[in-house]
């Protein structure tokens, strides 16, 4: 009952004209950047951080969430019509969606993707609304040792999830944690790693790092490669709508995809790629027409797209209740909260209920807006693919520079922006994930503060981390998550050597 009352109050916030406008802008931008390969919601939110710092926090965060949801929708368009997923989570959709488009059924493929995303987003957002308060009640009971252990789990799982190598993920994470040490030590008041530069006394701005790594780094990386003409877009033939048979074959995959996407997205090592491919393989086994798989089975589009969007809502569960990002976009959204002096977690639900529940309520509205916008404007989304990449990324560089200077007109800040941008370019070139570095900068100082608090309570005894059951369990999970990839890699090499 309390959840329904809170949600009703949230809708009263979300239906304010300014909030509706922010939501509309968010879903429109999100769909547009989801369509464009290589852009994505994480880069877009990072670009908008500097220009939204003076806006209303609730409106800005609603817009960021709309961009996140819209990016999930938009990625399916290029996956189906171009066989080039705008988002990695749309890879599974491309397997059958592009085949449907080539067979003249691009319209039904786009329709089942859009409606499946709507159904999954709606169900998953309901799950978020009812699961979040329960997790908040649990998190209130956490001591500093439990929070420290939880952040260790986040560090390990984020490092293992992003990129192909856990070791490279950990390297990126440690770089971010090292940057988090810069500034004034809150316990002793001493300057750390500032090298006599006054601008570093307040630490490294998360916004500068995020924009540098995601926007400037991506632009430099694209510029370093030889630009290619976009691939030929598969034209949409026939009806844009689904027939009775398509509806009959799609509804069960939508529900199964949602069941995969939401819980896996809510896990610290979840993400959207795992549930989408899990949904694809499940639909391939359960399909009554297995001969169609690989040639354009509608179940292979319906299930993965539902899983994709459900995982987006699932990602917001640990972000809002525990302050733990489980995707690149969630990490940038966490930076968005922090630029307004807000820390997601149990206290945020108690201190800013209108903001939190307004954000959750806006997700329902965003889903409705997206299903209305996607199909009628399909021609507009396709035309975006004709924008030359040099123009697009040159615009990103200019926008990133102007936005950063607007927040902090300092030569040092500008130097850091392009320094982080060049670092982001090098990390992409040598296949190091950039998201763990942002997570390290955000969560590193928080983990340090919780560890210090725990040691102060225990009079310096580190065994307090193992004496409490919750923290001991979490540290055990972190250890297994850290060791497992290396053990599996060793076993695979051993088996390969035997063969």
Where are these regions (language model features)?
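Helix-loop-helix hairpins and the membrane-proximal interhelical loops
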Residues: 1-60, 133, 140, 191-297, ...
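Transmembrane alpha-helix interface/packing and boundary motifs in multi-pass membrane proteins
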Residues: 27-41, 70-83, 158-163, 259-268, ...
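Short helix-coil transition sites and intra-membrane helix breaks within transmembrane domains
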Residues: 33-42, 80-91, 123-127, 264-273, ...
């Amino acid at each position: 009952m309390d959840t329904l009352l809170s949600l009703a109050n949230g809708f009263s916030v979300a239906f304010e004209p300014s909030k509706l406008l922010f939501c509309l802008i968010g879903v429109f931008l999100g769909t547009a950047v989801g369509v464009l390969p290589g852009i994505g919601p994480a880069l877009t939110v990072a670009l908008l951080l500097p220009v939204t710092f003076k806006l209303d926090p609730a409106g800005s965060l609603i817009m960021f969430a709309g961009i996140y949801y819209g990016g999930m929708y938009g990625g399916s368009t290029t996956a189906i019509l171009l066989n080039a997923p705008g988002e990695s989570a749309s890879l599974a959709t491309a397997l059958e969606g592009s085949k449907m488009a080539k067979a003249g059924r691009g319209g039904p493929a786009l329709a089942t993707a859009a409606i499946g995303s709507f159904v999954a987003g709606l169900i998953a957002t309901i799950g978020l609304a009812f699961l979040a308060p329960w997790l908040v009640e649990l998190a209130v009971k956490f001591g500093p040792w439990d929070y420290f252990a939880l952040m260790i789990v986040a560090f390990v799982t984020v490092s293992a999830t992003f990129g192909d190598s856990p070791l490279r993920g950990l390297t990126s994470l440690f770089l971010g944690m090292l940057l988090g040490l810069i500034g004034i030590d809150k316990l002793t008041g001493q300057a750390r790693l500032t090298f006599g530069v006054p601008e570093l006394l307040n630490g490294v701005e998360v916004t500068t790092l995020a924009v540098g790594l995601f926007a400037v780094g991506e632009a430099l990386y694209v510029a370093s490669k030889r630009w290619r003409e976009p691939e030929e877009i598969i034209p949409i033939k026939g009806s844009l709508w689904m027939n009775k048979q398509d509806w009959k074959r799609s509804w069960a995959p939508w529900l199964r995809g949602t069941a995969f996407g939401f819980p896996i997205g809510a896990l610290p090592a979840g993400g959207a790629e795992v549930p989408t491919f899990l949904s694809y393989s499940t639909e391939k086994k359960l399909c009554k027409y297995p001969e169609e798989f690989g040639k354009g089975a509608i179940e292979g589009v319906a299930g993965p797209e539902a899983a994709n969007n459900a995982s987006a809502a699932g990602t917001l569960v640990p972000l809002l209740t525990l302050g733990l990002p489980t995707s690149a976009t969630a990490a940038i959204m966490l930076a968005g909260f922090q630029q307004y002096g807000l820390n997601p977690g149990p206290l945020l639900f108690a201190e800013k209920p209108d903001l939190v529940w307004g954000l959750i309520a806006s997700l329902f509205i965003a889903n409705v807006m997206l299903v209305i916008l996607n199909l009628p404007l399909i021609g507009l989304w396709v035309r975006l693919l004709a924008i030359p990449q040099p123009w697009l990324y040159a615009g990103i560089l200019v926008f990133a520079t102007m936005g950063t200077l607007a927040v902090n007109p300092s030569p040092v800040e500008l130097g850091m922006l392009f320094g982080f941008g060049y670092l982001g370019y090098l990390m992409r070139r040598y296949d190091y994930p950039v998201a763990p570095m942002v997570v390290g900068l955000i969560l590193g100082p928080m983990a340090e503060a919780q560890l210090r608090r725990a040691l102060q309570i225990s009079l310096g005894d580190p065994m307090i981390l193992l004496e409490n059951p919750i923290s001991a369990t979490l540290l055990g999970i972190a250890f297994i998550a850290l060791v497992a990839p290396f053990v599996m890699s060793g076993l695979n090499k051993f088996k390969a050597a035997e063969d």
